[in-house]
Amino acid sequence: MGAAAKLAFAVFLISCSSGAILGRSETQECLFFNANWERDRTNQTGVEPCYGDKDKRRHCFATWKNISGSIEIVKQGCWLDDINCYDRTDCIEKKDSPEVYFCCCEGNMCNEKFSYFPEMEVTQPTSNPVTPKPPYYNILLYSLVPLMLIAGIVICAFWVYRHHKMAYPPVLVPTQDPGPPPPSPLLGLKPLQLLEVKARGRFGCVWKAQLLNEYVAVKIFPIQDKQSWQNEYEVYSLPGMKHENILQFIGAEKRGTSVDVDLWLITAFHEKGSLSDFLKANVVSWNELCHIAETMARGLAYLHEDIPGLKDGHKPAISHRDIKSKNVLLKNNLTACIADFGLALKFEAGKSAGDTHGQVGTRRYMAPEVLEGAINFQRDAFLRIDMYAMGLVLWELASRCTAADGPVDEYMLPFEEEIGQHPSLEDMQEVVVHKKKRPVLRDYWQKHAGMAMLCETIEECWDHDAEARLSAGCVGERITQMQRLTNIITTEDIVTVVTMVTNVDFPPKESSL
Protein backbone atom coordinates (compact mmCIF):
# COMPACT_ATOMS: atom_id res chain seq x y z
CA MET A 1 0.00 0.00 0.00
CA GLY A 2 1.46 3.35 -1.09
CA ALA A 3 2.14 6.20 1.33
CA ALA A 4 -0.56 8.39 -0.27
CA ALA A 5 -3.12 5.60 0.01
CA LYS A 6 -2.24 5.02 3.68
CA LEU A 7 -2.60 8.72 4.46
CA ALA A 8 -5.98 8.93 2.72
CA PHE A 9 -7.19 5.85 4.56
CA ALA A 10 -6.03 7.30 7.92
CA VAL A 11 -7.93 10.55 7.27
CA PHE A 12 -11.02 8.49 6.43
CA LEU A 13 -10.68 6.54 9.69
CA ILE A 14 -10.29 9.73 11.74
CA SER A 15 -13.36 11.34 10.22
CA CYS A 16 -15.40 8.18 10.79
CA SER A 17 -14.19 7.91 14.41
CA SER A 18 -14.94 11.60 15.06
CA GLY A 19 -18.44 11.16 13.78
CA ALA A 20 -18.98 8.11 15.96
CA ILE A 21 -17.64 9.76 19.10
CA LEU A 22 -18.93 13.29 18.77
CA GLY A 23 -22.12 12.75 16.83
CA ARG A 24 -25.28 12.38 18.89
CA SER A 25 -28.93 13.31 18.85
CA GLU A 26 -29.84 16.84 19.86
CA THR A 27 -32.92 15.62 21.73
CA GLN A 28 -33.49 12.56 23.86
CA GLU A 29 -36.34 11.14 25.90
CA CYS A 30 -36.13 8.59 28.68
CA LEU A 31 -38.65 6.48 30.52
CA PHE A 32 -39.32 8.16 33.90
CA PHE A 33 -40.19 6.37 37.14
CA ASN A 34 -39.87 7.44 40.80
CA ALA A 35 -40.71 4.99 43.57
CA ASN A 36 -40.74 7.91 46.03
CA TRP A 37 -42.98 10.11 43.88
CA GLU A 38 -45.29 11.05 46.75
CA ARG A 39 -42.42 12.28 48.96
CA ASP A 40 -40.65 14.08 46.11
CA ARG A 41 -43.93 15.48 44.71
CA THR A 42 -43.31 14.24 41.17
CA ASN A 43 -45.19 12.04 38.73
CA GLN A 44 -44.79 8.33 39.39
CA THR A 45 -44.16 7.39 35.78
CA GLY A 46 -44.02 8.93 32.33
CA VAL A 47 -41.63 10.11 29.64
CA GLU A 48 -38.89 12.61 30.61
CA PRO A 49 -37.25 14.86 27.99
CA CYS A 50 -33.52 15.29 28.69
CA TYR A 51 -32.18 18.83 28.80
CA GLY A 52 -28.61 20.05 29.19
CA ASP A 53 -25.80 22.04 27.66
CA LYS A 54 -25.23 21.42 23.95
CA ASP A 55 -21.67 20.30 24.58
CA LYS A 56 -22.75 17.69 27.15
CA ARG A 57 -24.05 14.22 26.29
CA ARG A 58 -27.40 12.98 27.56
CA HIS A 59 -28.17 9.48 28.77
CA CYS A 60 -30.96 7.46 30.36
CA PHE A 61 -30.54 5.50 33.58
CA ALA A 62 -32.31 2.94 35.72
CA THR A 63 -31.77 1.86 39.34
CA TRP A 64 -33.40 -1.18 40.91
CA LYS A 65 -33.13 -3.69 43.73
CA ASN A 66 -33.39 -7.47 43.66
CA ILE A 67 -35.27 -8.47 46.80
CA SER A 68 -35.43 -12.27 47.04
CA GLY A 69 -35.73 -12.59 43.27
CA SER A 70 -38.32 -9.81 42.96
CA ILE A 71 -37.25 -6.76 40.92
CA GLU A 72 -38.12 -3.43 42.60
CA ILE A 73 -37.48 -0.34 40.46
CA VAL A 74 -36.14 2.66 42.42
CA LYS A 75 -35.77 5.33 39.71
CA GLN A 76 -35.60 5.80 35.96
CA GLY A 77 -34.95 9.00 34.05
CA CYS A 78 -32.34 11.26 32.47
CA TRP A 79 -28.63 11.16 33.39
CA LEU A 80 -26.20 13.87 32.25
CA ASP A 81 -22.76 13.48 30.64
CA ASP A 82 -21.26 10.43 32.37
CA ILE A 83 -18.29 8.86 30.57
CA ASN A 84 -19.36 5.45 31.88
CA CYS A 85 -22.51 5.71 29.74
CA TYR A 86 -20.91 6.71 26.43
CA ASP A 87 -21.95 4.66 23.37
CA ARG A 88 -23.98 2.16 25.39
CA THR A 89 -27.15 1.30 23.50
CA ASP A 90 -28.37 -1.17 26.14
CA CYS A 91 -28.90 -0.51 29.86
CA ILE A 92 -26.81 -3.26 31.51
CA GLU A 93 -25.39 -3.48 35.05
CA LYS A 94 -22.08 -5.38 34.98
CA LYS A 95 -20.82 -5.06 38.56
CA ASP A 96 -20.89 -8.21 40.64
CA SER A 97 -23.78 -8.34 43.19
CA PRO A 98 -24.23 -4.61 44.01
CA GLU A 99 -26.64 -3.57 46.76
CA VAL A 100 -28.46 -1.29 44.33
CA TYR A 101 -28.28 -2.05 40.61
CA PHE A 102 -27.50 0.85 38.27
CA CYS A 103 -27.18 1.09 34.50
CA CYS A 104 -27.11 3.88 31.93
CA CYS A 105 -27.29 4.07 28.16
CA GLU A 106 -27.62 6.41 25.16
CA GLY A 107 -30.68 6.52 22.92
CA ASN A 108 -34.37 7.36 23.18
CA MET A 109 -36.15 5.26 25.84
CA CYS A 110 -33.11 2.96 26.08
CA ASN A 111 -33.79 2.52 29.82
CA GLU A 112 -37.18 0.94 29.18
CA LYS A 113 -35.43 -2.44 29.36
CA PHE A 114 -32.59 -3.10 31.73
CA SER A 115 -30.62 -6.20 32.63
CA TYR A 116 -27.87 -7.58 34.83
CA PHE A 117 -24.93 -9.41 33.27
CA PRO A 118 -21.93 -9.50 35.65
CA GLU A 119 -18.56 -9.62 33.96
CA MET A 120 -17.17 -13.15 34.14
CA GLU A 121 -13.48 -13.99 34.21
CA VAL A 122 -12.69 -15.73 30.92
CA THR A 123 -10.35 -18.72 31.14
CA GLN A 124 -7.99 -19.31 28.25
CA PRO A 125 -8.25 -22.73 26.54
CA THR A 126 -5.23 -25.00 26.86
CA SER A 127 -4.85 -25.29 23.12
CA ASN A 128 -5.75 -22.85 20.40
CA PRO A 129 -5.35 -24.25 16.92
CA VAL A 130 -4.10 -21.61 14.50
CA THR A 131 -5.96 -21.37 11.24
CA PRO A 132 -3.89 -20.34 8.28
CA LYS A 133 -4.51 -16.79 7.04
CA PRO A 134 -3.76 -15.35 3.65
CA PRO A 135 -0.46 -13.41 3.46
CA TYR A 136 -2.10 -10.02 2.82
CA TYR A 137 -4.01 -10.31 6.13
CA ASN A 138 -0.85 -9.60 8.15
CA ILE A 139 0.01 -6.63 5.93
CA LEU A 140 -3.41 -5.04 6.54
CA LEU A 141 -3.27 -5.85 10.25
CA TYR A 142 0.16 -4.29 10.80
CA SER A 143 -0.75 -1.22 8.71
CA LEU A 144 -4.23 -0.38 9.98
CA VAL A 145 -4.05 -1.16 13.70
CA PRO A 146 -1.33 1.42 14.53
CA LEU A 147 -3.14 4.06 12.46
CA MET A 148 -6.43 3.35 14.21
CA LEU A 149 -4.78 3.47 17.63
CA ILE A 150 -3.08 6.79 16.90
CA ALA A 151 -6.29 8.30 15.52
CA GLY A 152 -8.26 7.09 18.55
CA ILE A 153 -5.70 8.47 21.02
CA VAL A 154 -5.64 11.88 19.30
CA ILE A 155 -9.43 12.16 19.25
CA CYS A 156 -9.83 11.00 22.86
CA ALA A 157 -7.10 13.36 24.07
CA PHE A 158 -8.74 16.29 22.30
CA TRP A 159 -12.16 15.44 23.71
CA VAL A 160 -10.88 14.98 27.28
CA TYR A 161 -8.95 18.27 27.10
CA ARG A 162 -11.95 20.20 25.76
CA HIS A 163 -14.39 18.63 28.21
CA HIS A 164 -12.10 19.13 31.21
CA LYS A 165 -11.33 22.74 30.28
CA MET A 166 -15.03 23.63 30.20
CA ALA A 167 -16.00 21.65 33.30
CA TYR A 168 -13.44 23.09 35.73
CA PRO A 169 -12.33 26.69 36.28
CA PRO A 170 -8.57 27.28 36.48
CA VAL A 171 -7.06 27.15 39.97
CA LEU A 172 -3.69 28.04 41.40
CA VAL A 173 -1.08 25.31 41.39
CA PRO A 174 -0.91 24.08 45.01
CA THR A 175 2.36 24.37 46.87
CA GLN A 176 1.52 21.05 48.50
CA ASP A 177 -0.49 18.11 47.24
CA PRO A 178 -3.48 17.58 49.54
CA GLY A 179 -2.61 13.89 49.70
CA PRO A 180 -4.96 10.97 49.25
CA PRO A 181 -8.64 11.51 49.98
CA PRO A 182 -9.64 10.50 53.51
CA PRO A 183 -11.60 7.27 54.02
CA SER A 184 -15.17 7.94 52.97
CA PRO A 185 -18.40 6.03 53.46
CA LEU A 186 -19.23 7.00 49.87
CA LEU A 187 -16.40 4.99 48.34
CA GLY A 188 -17.77 2.14 46.28
CA LEU A 189 -21.24 3.65 45.93
CA LYS A 190 -22.76 5.12 42.78
CA PRO A 191 -21.53 8.54 41.62
CA LEU A 192 -23.11 11.75 42.84
CA GLN A 193 -24.99 13.95 40.39
CA LEU A 194 -24.73 17.68 41.13
CA LEU A 195 -28.10 19.37 40.57
CA GLU A 196 -27.99 23.05 41.55
CA VAL A 197 -25.95 25.55 43.57
CA LYS A 198 -27.77 26.39 46.81
CA ALA A 199 -25.26 28.74 48.48
CA ARG A 200 -21.88 30.38 48.04
CA GLY A 201 -19.59 31.28 50.91
CA ARG A 202 -16.08 32.25 51.85
CA PHE A 203 -14.69 28.72 51.43
CA GLY A 204 -16.60 27.48 48.37
CA CYS A 205 -20.10 26.66 47.21
CA VAL A 206 -22.78 24.22 48.35
CA TRP A 207 -24.60 22.06 45.80
CA LYS A 208 -27.80 20.10 46.08
CA ALA A 209 -26.90 16.67 44.69
CA GLN A 210 -28.52 13.30 44.14
CA LEU A 211 -27.11 10.04 45.45
CA LEU A 212 -29.32 7.30 44.03
CA ASN A 213 -32.79 7.99 45.46
CA GLU A 214 -31.91 10.64 48.07
CA TYR A 215 -30.72 14.23 48.08
CA VAL A 216 -27.44 15.22 49.74
CA ALA A 217 -25.48 18.46 50.09
CA VAL A 218 -22.01 18.70 48.52
CA LYS A 219 -19.75 21.49 49.72
CA ILE A 220 -16.99 22.03 47.13
CA PHE A 221 -13.74 23.70 48.19
CA PRO A 222 -11.08 24.92 45.74
CA ILE A 223 -7.56 23.68 46.45
CA GLN A 224 -6.64 27.09 47.94
CA ASP A 225 -9.01 26.33 50.85
CA LYS A 226 -7.64 22.86 51.55
CA GLN A 227 -7.02 23.77 55.21
CA SER A 228 -10.68 24.58 55.81
CA TRP A 229 -11.80 21.33 54.12
CA GLN A 230 -9.26 19.31 56.11
CA ASN A 231 -10.26 20.96 59.38
CA GLU A 232 -13.97 20.40 58.78
CA TYR A 233 -13.38 16.75 57.86
CA GLU A 234 -11.27 16.19 61.00
CA VAL A 235 -13.94 17.74 63.25
CA TYR A 236 -16.72 15.64 61.71
CA SER A 237 -14.53 12.53 62.14
CA LEU A 238 -14.03 13.02 65.89
CA PRO A 239 -15.66 10.48 68.22
CA GLY A 240 -19.20 11.33 69.27
CA MET A 241 -19.98 13.80 66.48
CA LYS A 242 -23.27 12.13 65.55
CA HIS A 243 -25.91 14.29 67.21
CA GLU A 244 -29.41 15.40 66.24
CA ASN A 245 -28.41 19.06 66.39
CA ILE A 246 -25.13 18.77 64.47
CA LEU A 247 -25.25 18.46 60.68
CA GLN A 248 -24.97 14.81 59.61
CA PHE A 249 -21.66 14.02 57.89
CA ILE A 250 -21.67 11.49 55.02
CA GLY A 251 -18.20 11.56 53.47
CA ALA A 252 -15.25 13.49 52.03
CA GLU A 253 -13.57 13.04 48.65
CA LYS A 254 -10.92 14.57 46.41
CA ARG A 255 -11.95 15.05 42.77
CA GLY A 256 -9.67 15.85 39.84
CA THR A 257 -5.91 15.82 39.22
CA SER A 258 -3.12 17.24 41.39
CA VAL A 259 -3.50 20.62 39.66
CA ASP A 260 -7.20 20.83 38.80
CA VAL A 261 -8.50 19.43 42.06
CA ASP A 262 -11.69 20.09 44.01
CA LEU A 263 -12.25 18.96 47.58
CA TRP A 264 -15.73 17.65 48.35
CA LEU A 265 -17.52 17.39 51.69
CA ILE A 266 -20.83 15.49 51.56
CA THR A 267 -23.49 16.00 54.25
CA ALA A 268 -27.22 15.62 54.76
CA PHE A 269 -29.36 18.03 52.71
CA HIS A 270 -32.02 20.21 54.38
CA GLU A 271 -34.48 21.86 52.00
CA LYS A 272 -35.31 24.77 54.33
CA GLY A 273 -31.69 25.90 54.22
CA SER A 274 -30.11 28.21 56.78
CA LEU A 275 -31.87 30.04 59.60
CA SER A 276 -30.90 33.33 57.94
CA ASP A 277 -32.58 32.38 54.66
CA PHE A 278 -35.65 31.09 56.51
CA LEU A 279 -36.09 34.29 58.55
CA LYS A 280 -35.80 36.45 55.41
CA ALA A 281 -38.92 34.80 54.00
CA ASN A 282 -40.86 33.81 57.15
CA VAL A 283 -41.95 35.03 60.55
CA VAL A 284 -42.02 32.61 63.50
CA SER A 285 -44.52 31.97 66.28
CA TRP A 286 -43.46 31.84 69.92
CA ASN A 287 -43.44 28.02 69.96
CA GLU A 288 -41.43 27.91 66.72
CA LEU A 289 -38.92 30.40 68.13
CA CYS A 290 -38.52 28.29 71.27
CA HIS A 291 -38.04 25.07 69.30
CA ILE A 292 -35.41 26.57 66.98
CA ALA A 293 -33.57 28.35 69.81
CA GLU A 294 -33.62 25.34 72.15
CA THR A 295 -32.33 22.86 69.54
CA MET A 296 -29.66 25.33 68.41
CA ALA A 297 -28.52 25.79 72.03
CA ARG A 298 -28.46 22.02 72.60
CA GLY A 299 -26.33 21.52 69.50
CA LEU A 300 -23.83 24.17 70.62
CA ALA A 301 -23.82 22.81 74.19
CA TYR A 302 -22.98 19.33 72.88
CA LEU A 303 -20.23 20.78 70.69
CA HIS A 304 -18.73 22.60 73.69
CA GLU A 305 -18.88 19.55 75.95
CA ASP A 306 -15.88 17.34 76.72
CA ILE A 307 -17.18 13.74 76.84
CA PRO A 308 -14.76 10.93 77.80
CA GLY A 309 -15.57 7.23 77.67
CA LEU A 310 -17.69 7.07 74.53
CA LYS A 311 -17.82 3.77 72.64
CA ASP A 312 -15.76 5.21 69.77
CA GLY A 313 -13.40 7.26 71.94
CA HIS A 314 -13.08 10.61 73.71
CA LYS A 315 -15.02 13.57 72.30
CA PRO A 316 -13.08 16.78 73.05
CA ALA A 317 -14.63 20.18 73.65
CA ILE A 318 -14.94 22.10 70.37
CA SER A 319 -15.24 25.84 69.77
CA HIS A 320 -17.08 26.66 66.52
CA ARG A 321 -15.61 30.19 66.04
CA ASP A 322 -18.11 31.17 63.31
CA ILE A 323 -21.56 30.93 64.89
CA LYS A 324 -24.09 32.88 62.81
CA SER A 325 -27.56 32.36 61.38
CA LYS A 326 -26.03 31.25 58.04
CA ASN A 327 -24.34 28.34 59.82
CA VAL A 328 -27.50 27.10 61.55
CA LEU A 329 -29.54 24.83 59.26
CA LEU A 330 -33.20 23.93 59.71
CA LYS A 331 -34.72 20.49 59.22
CA ASN A 332 -38.28 20.12 57.91
CA ASN A 333 -39.71 20.23 61.46
CA LEU A 334 -37.64 23.39 62.24
CA THR A 335 -35.15 21.48 64.38
CA ALA A 336 -31.83 23.35 64.20
CA CYS A 337 -28.45 21.77 63.49
CA ILE A 338 -25.03 23.42 63.64
CA ALA A 339 -22.97 23.38 60.40
CA ASP A 340 -19.66 24.62 58.91
CA PHE A 341 -16.67 23.62 61.04
CA GLY A 342 -13.98 25.10 58.80
CA LEU A 343 -12.72 27.39 61.60
CA ALA A 344 -13.52 25.12 64.57
CA LEU A 345 -10.95 24.41 67.29
CA LYS A 346 -10.81 21.15 69.23
CA PHE A 347 -9.33 21.06 72.72
CA GLU A 348 -7.69 17.68 73.32
CA ALA A 349 -5.82 16.98 76.54
CA GLY A 350 -2.07 17.38 76.13
CA LYS A 351 -2.35 18.70 72.57
CA SER A 352 -2.13 22.18 71.10
CA ALA A 353 -5.40 23.62 69.84
CA GLY A 354 -3.67 24.32 66.51
CA ASP A 355 -3.87 27.67 64.75
CA THR A 356 -5.42 29.88 67.42
CA HIS A 357 -5.28 33.12 65.49
CA GLY A 358 -7.83 35.27 67.32
CA GLN A 359 -9.49 37.44 64.68
CA VAL A 360 -11.35 34.84 62.63
CA GLY A 361 -15.04 34.50 61.86
CA THR A 362 -17.62 36.91 60.47
CA ARG A 363 -17.05 40.55 61.48
CA ARG A 364 -20.57 41.46 62.58
CA TYR A 365 -20.69 38.41 64.91
CA MET A 366 -17.24 39.03 66.49
CA ALA A 367 -17.21 39.41 70.27
CA PRO A 368 -15.69 42.59 71.79
CA GLU A 369 -12.54 40.76 72.92
CA VAL A 370 -12.02 39.42 69.37
CA LEU A 371 -12.42 42.90 67.86
CA GLU A 372 -9.94 44.26 70.41
CA GLY A 373 -7.46 41.44 69.80
CA ALA A 374 -7.45 40.78 73.54
CA ILE A 375 -8.29 37.06 73.69
CA ASN A 376 -7.21 34.77 76.48
CA PHE A 377 -6.15 31.70 74.46
CA GLN A 378 -7.80 29.22 76.80
CA ARG A 379 -10.66 26.84 76.09
CA ASP A 380 -13.34 28.72 78.04
CA ALA A 381 -12.44 32.01 76.35
CA PHE A 382 -13.19 30.52 72.92
CA LEU A 383 -16.46 28.97 74.12
CA ARG A 384 -17.58 32.37 75.47
CA ILE A 385 -16.88 33.92 72.05
CA ASP A 386 -19.38 31.42 70.58
CA MET A 387 -21.95 32.47 73.20
CA TYR A 388 -21.69 36.15 72.25
CA ALA A 389 -22.50 35.23 68.64
CA MET A 390 -25.35 33.00 69.80
CA GLY A 391 -26.90 36.00 71.56
CA LEU A 392 -26.98 37.83 68.21
CA VAL A 393 -28.63 34.83 66.50
CA LEU A 394 -31.28 34.75 69.26
CA TRP A 395 -31.90 38.46 68.58
CA GLU A 396 -32.46 37.65 64.88
CA LEU A 397 -35.09 35.10 65.93
CA ALA A 398 -36.76 37.57 68.31
CA SER A 399 -36.92 40.26 65.61
CA ARG A 400 -39.05 37.97 63.40
CA CYS A 401 -41.34 36.60 66.12
CA THR A 402 -45.09 37.34 66.10
CA ALA A 403 -45.58 36.75 69.84
CA ALA A 404 -45.36 40.39 71.02
CA ASP A 405 -48.22 42.84 70.51
CA GLY A 406 -46.47 45.04 67.96
CA PRO A 407 -45.14 45.15 64.39
CA VAL A 408 -42.72 42.46 63.23
CA ASP A 409 -39.59 44.04 61.78
CA GLU A 410 -38.28 43.23 58.31
CA TYR A 411 -35.41 40.79 58.59
CA MET A 412 -32.08 42.47 59.27
CA LEU A 413 -28.67 41.12 60.22
CA PRO A 414 -27.25 42.11 63.63
CA PHE A 415 -25.99 45.73 63.53
CA GLU A 416 -27.35 46.22 60.00
CA GLU A 417 -29.55 49.04 61.32
CA GLU A 418 -26.54 50.71 62.95
CA ILE A 419 -23.76 50.07 60.39
CA GLY A 420 -25.26 48.65 57.19
CA GLN A 421 -24.66 45.46 55.24
CA HIS A 422 -20.88 45.59 54.77
CA PRO A 423 -19.22 46.79 57.99
CA SER A 424 -15.46 47.14 58.19
CA LEU A 425 -13.45 45.92 61.16
CA GLU A 426 -13.07 49.55 62.27
CA ASP A 427 -16.87 50.06 62.11
CA MET A 428 -17.44 47.05 64.36
CA GLN A 429 -14.74 48.14 66.81
CA GLU A 430 -16.29 51.62 67.09
CA VAL A 431 -19.85 50.36 67.70
CA VAL A 432 -19.26 47.20 69.76
CA VAL A 433 -16.06 47.95 71.69
CA HIS A 434 -15.98 51.72 72.17
CA LYS A 435 -19.71 52.58 72.23
CA LYS A 436 -20.70 49.17 73.66
CA LYS A 437 -23.83 49.10 71.51
CA ARG A 438 -25.91 46.01 70.77
CA PRO A 439 -28.88 45.44 68.42
CA VAL A 440 -32.07 47.10 69.67
CA LEU A 441 -34.45 45.12 71.89
CA ARG A 442 -37.89 46.64 71.14
CA ASP A 443 -39.89 48.00 74.09
CA TYR A 444 -43.05 46.12 73.11
CA TRP A 445 -41.20 42.79 73.29
CA GLN A 446 -41.17 43.28 77.07
CA LYS A 447 -44.98 43.13 77.13
CA HIS A 448 -44.91 39.42 76.30
CA ALA A 449 -43.80 37.30 79.25
CA GLY A 450 -41.72 34.88 77.20
CA MET A 451 -40.13 37.58 75.04
CA ALA A 452 -39.20 39.54 78.16
CA MET A 453 -37.38 36.48 79.53
CA LEU A 454 -35.73 35.90 76.15
CA CYS A 455 -34.46 39.51 76.07
CA GLU A 456 -32.85 39.01 79.47
CA THR A 457 -31.17 35.82 78.24
CA ILE A 458 -29.93 37.55 75.06
CA GLU A 459 -28.38 40.36 77.11
CA GLU A 460 -26.56 37.83 79.30
CA CYS A 461 -25.21 36.05 76.20
CA TRP A 462 -23.74 39.19 74.60
CA ASP A 463 -22.47 40.72 77.87
CA HIS A 464 -19.34 42.84 77.33
CA ASP A 465 -17.68 40.92 80.18
CA ALA A 466 -16.93 37.52 78.63
CA GLU A 467 -16.86 35.73 81.99
CA ALA A 468 -20.41 36.91 82.74
CA ARG A 469 -21.93 35.21 79.67
CA LEU A 470 -24.24 32.22 79.92
CA SER A 471 -23.23 28.76 78.75
CA ALA A 472 -25.05 27.07 75.86
CA GLY A 473 -26.45 24.42 78.21
CA CYS A 474 -27.89 27.12 80.48
CA VAL A 475 -29.52 28.87 77.49
CA GLY A 476 -31.15 25.61 76.42
CA GLU A 477 -32.58 25.03 79.91
CA ARG A 478 -33.85 28.61 80.14
CA ILE A 479 -35.68 28.41 76.84
CA THR A 480 -37.32 25.14 77.91
CA GLN A 481 -38.55 26.87 81.08
CA MET A 482 -39.71 29.96 79.13
CA GLN A 483 -41.84 27.87 76.80
CA ARG A 484 -43.28 25.79 79.63
CA LEU A 485 -44.10 28.90 81.65
CA THR A 486 -45.67 30.94 78.85
CA ASN A 487 -47.81 28.01 77.70
CA ILE A 488 -49.61 27.98 81.06
CA ILE A 489 -49.94 31.76 81.44
CA THR A 490 -53.38 33.26 80.75
CA THR A 491 -53.85 36.72 79.27
CA GLU A 492 -54.77 38.18 82.70
CA ASP A 493 -51.54 36.89 84.20
CA ILE A 494 -49.17 38.47 81.67
CA VAL A 495 -48.82 41.86 83.40
CA THR A 496 -48.06 40.18 86.73
CA VAL A 497 -45.50 37.82 85.21
CA VAL A 498 -43.69 40.62 83.36
CA THR A 499 -43.19 42.52 86.61
CA MET A 500 -41.71 39.37 88.16
CA VAL A 501 -39.45 38.47 85.24
CA THR A 502 -36.22 39.21 87.11
CA ASN A 503 -37.25 36.84 89.92
CA VAL A 504 -37.96 33.82 87.70
CA ASP A 505 -36.20 30.71 89.00
CA PHE A 506 -33.91 30.32 85.98
CA PRO A 507 -31.14 27.74 85.94
CA PRO A 508 -28.15 29.16 87.81
CA LYS A 509 -26.09 31.55 85.73
CA GLU A 510 -22.83 29.95 84.72
CA SER A 511 -19.85 30.59 82.53
CA SER A 512 -19.26 28.67 79.32
CA LEU A 513 -18.02 25.56 81.11
Curated annotation (Swiss-Prot):
One of its GO terms (molecular function) is activin receptor activity. On ligand binding, forms a receptor complex consisting of two type II and two type I transmembrane serine/threonine kinases. Type II receptors phosphorylate and activate type I receptors which autophosphorylate, then bind and activate SMAD transcriptional regulators. Receptor for activin A, activin B and inhibin A. Mediates induction of adipogenesis by GDF6. This is Activin receptor type-2A. Part of a complex consisting of MAGI2/ARIP1, ACVR2A, ACVR1B and SMAD3. Interacts with MAGI2/ARIP1. Interacts with type I receptor ACVR1. Interacts with BMP7. Interacts with TSC22D1/TSC-22. Interacts with activin A/INHBA. The chain crosses the membrane at residues 136-161. Keywords: ATP-binding, Cell membrane, Disulfide bond, Glycoprotein, Kinase, Magnesium, Manganese, Membrane, Metal-binding, Nucleotide-binding, Receptor, Serine/threonine-protein kinase, Signal, Transferase, Transmembrane, Transmembrane helix. Its cofactor is Mg(2+); Mn(2+). CDD domains: STKc_ACVR2a, TFP_LU_ECD_ACVR2A. Glycans are attached at residues 43, 66. It catalyses: L-threonyl-[receptor-protein] + ATP = O-phospho-L-threonyl-[receptor-protein] + ADP + H(+); L-seryl-[receptor-protein] + ATP = O-phospho-L-seryl-[receptor-protein] + ADP + H(+). Residues 192-485 form the Protein kinase domain.
